[in-house]
């Protein structure tokens, strides 16, 4: 509790939180917030560095206890008579690691991310959902959604799928969490938990060695480009173990392969030596009998005792697969000064992500034409001054470097975006999709009960979503996207 004489307020934490245990609890909480005109925020696991699940002077609905998991042999969506194949229904509080463990026991896996503590159907799914292992071969997480159960702004429980409330269903497939309603559960396609062989190529050099980027990172990006063309997905991770050193690792994921020797031979047949450039290199290989095991072993992106900030950019297939693509990208990324615990990594798009054009999603159309997502994770010092400095440096220095890789596009991922992104409407969704999202928001939540930072409709509120600006939402949104 705050002392009355204290000049330090509560901050961006909610004053009250309803830790819900059922859908009826959520309905009662939403109606309570609406009746009393409260600033409402939705928290799933809180795995969010941009403050979307918190706000000052607010009332929070915390969904972490909704832990139901139901497996379906042939899921039939409400209002339909057609089976959609194997699927699983996950409650709003189920985390990725829990879904992976349940799947491993029952012979399936979902399209999920690497961080085990991320909620499987919260902001990850509603924001798009990228998997370093599965997206190249399966698509985005939102490509797998068959049905949502949602508590709307008036407290009703709504089914959203291809046959019911199609506008809401579309908006929840990339329009962002905590914006259109409270998702209580989602049903997503499942896949067989097939084996994967993972090769790992690691390089390390002194931070002062400019050839680390020009030769080392360039070579790893060239390998990633080459193996993508061979239908093999991969992920590049760059970090600074100490203030005087840099390291990078490229993992290639050979789906449905259990022959270590074959994987290593393929890698070595394409790789070039780097030792002559003062760069140490090593290669290893491992076989996972179940792909979910690879995801379950990944560490969380959050370093202990620190907060983080994130920024991201899409790299188009045209840029990445150009002859000079790897060299260009390595050169641009070298402008980012990495400190200990900072991380720079790619997520493999292209492949099935590009092929799933028949599936309508709310994300920016450029996702279907992208080859990679590049994400920068900055560690934030535990002080007010440190946080402000890191945030301002991210916006003023880091993001322009990321956007310079593909300057004609400048598309970002809201789930991993700059918390101060000024052009979020066009960066995250594009003008046409944002206009459609704004119309859906107006239809389902005309009073803006649900509001998140840099979410659909947030431009007509102040930075914390407390005070509404004078202009109407539709008019303001239209002017911002040039309509």
UniProtKB/Swiss-Prot annotation:
Keywords: Alkaloid metabolism, FAD, Flavoprotein, Oxidoreductase. InterPro entries: BBE (IPR012951), FAD-bd_PCMH (IPR016166), FAD-bd_PCMH-like_sf (IPR036318), FAD-bd_PCMH_sub2 (IPR016169), FAD-linked_Oxidoreductase (IPR050416), Oxid_FAD_bind_N (IPR006094). Disruption phenotype: Abolishes the production of clavine alkaloids but also of more complex alkaloids such as ergopeptines. Accumulates N-methyl-dimethylallyltryptophan (Me-DMAT) and traces of dimethylallyltryptophan (DMAT). Its cofactor is FAD. It is an enzyme of class 1 (oxidoreductase). One of its GO terms (molecular function) is FAD binding. Its EC number is 1.-.-.-. Belongs to the oxygen-dependent FAD-linked oxidoreductase family. PANTHER family: BINDING OXIDOREDUCTASE, PUTATIVE (AFU_ORTHOLOGUE AFUA_1G17690)-RELATED, FAD-BINDING PCMH-TYPE DOMAIN-CONTAINING PROTEIN. FAD-linked oxidoreductase; part of the gene cluster that mediates the biosynthesis of fungal ergot alkaloid. DmaW catalyzes the first step of ergot alkaloid biosynthesis by condensing dimethylallyl diphosphate (DMAP) and tryptophan to form 4-dimethylallyl-L-tryptophan. The second step is catalyzed by the methyltransferase easF that methylates 4-dimethylallyl-L-tryptophan in the presence of S-adenosyl-L-methionine, resulting in the formation of 4-dimethylallyl-L-abrine. This is FAD-linked oxidoreductase easE. It comes from Claviceps purpurea (Ergot fungus). The gene is easE.
């Amino acid at each position: 509790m705050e002392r009355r004489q204290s000049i330090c307020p509560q901050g961006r934490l909610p004053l009250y939180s309803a830790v819900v245990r059922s859908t009826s609890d959520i309905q009662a909480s939403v109606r309570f917030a609406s009746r009393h005109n409260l600033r409402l925020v939705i928290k799933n696991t809180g795995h969010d560095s941009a403050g979307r699940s918190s706000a000052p002077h607010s009332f929070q609905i915390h969904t972490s206890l909704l832990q139901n998991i139901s497996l379906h042999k042939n899921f039939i969506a409400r209002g339909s008579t057609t089976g959609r194949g194997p699927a699983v229904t996950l409650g709003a509080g189920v985390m990725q690691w829990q879904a992976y463990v349940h799947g491993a026991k029952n012979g399936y896996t979902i399209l999920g991310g690497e961080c085990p503590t991320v909620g499987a159907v919260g902001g990850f799914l509603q924001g798009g959902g990228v998997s370093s292992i599965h997206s190249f071969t399966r698509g985005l997480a939102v490509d797998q959604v068959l049905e949502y159960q949602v508590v709307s702004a008036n407290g009703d429980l709504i089914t959203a799928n291809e046959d019911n409330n199609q506008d809401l269903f579309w908006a929840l497939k990339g329009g962002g969490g905590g914006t259109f309603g409270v998702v209580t559960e989602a049903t997503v396609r499942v896949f067989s938990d097939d084996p994967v062989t993972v090769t790992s190529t690691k390089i390390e050099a002194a931070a002062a060695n400019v050839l680390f980027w020009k030769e080392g990172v360039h070579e790893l990006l060239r390998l990633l480009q080459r193996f993508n063309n061979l239908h093999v997905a991969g992920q590049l991770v760059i970090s600074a173990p100490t203030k005087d050193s840099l390291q990078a690792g490229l993992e290639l994921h050979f789906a449905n392969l259990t022959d270590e020797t074959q994987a290593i031979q393929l890698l070595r047949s394409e790789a070039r030596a780097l030792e002559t450039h003062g760069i140490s290199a090593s290669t290893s290989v491992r076989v996972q009998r179940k792909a979910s095991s690879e995801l379950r072993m990944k560490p969380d992106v959050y370093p202990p005792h620190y907060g983080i900030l994130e920024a991201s950019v899409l790299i188009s297939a045209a840029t990445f697969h150009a002859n000079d693509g790897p060299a260009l990208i390595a050169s641009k990324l070298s402008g980012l000064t990495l400190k200990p615990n900072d991380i720079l990594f790619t997520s493999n798009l292209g492949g099935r992500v590009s092929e799933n054009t028949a599936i309508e999603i709310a994300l920016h159309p450029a996702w279907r034409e992208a080859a990679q997502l590049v994400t920068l994770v900055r560690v934030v010092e535990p002080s007010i001054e440190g946080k402000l400095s890191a945030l301002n440096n991210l916006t003023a220095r880091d993001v322009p470097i990321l956007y310079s890789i593909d300057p004609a596009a400048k598309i970002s991922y809201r789930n991993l975006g700059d918390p101060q992104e000024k052009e979020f409407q066009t960066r995250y969704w594009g003008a046409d999709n944002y206009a459609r999202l704004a119309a859906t928001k107006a239809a389902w939540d005309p009073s803006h009960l649900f509001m998140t930072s840099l979410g659909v409709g947030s431009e007509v509120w102040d930075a914390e979503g407390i005070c509404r600006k004078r202009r109407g939402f539709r008019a303001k949104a239209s002017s911002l996207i040039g309509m």
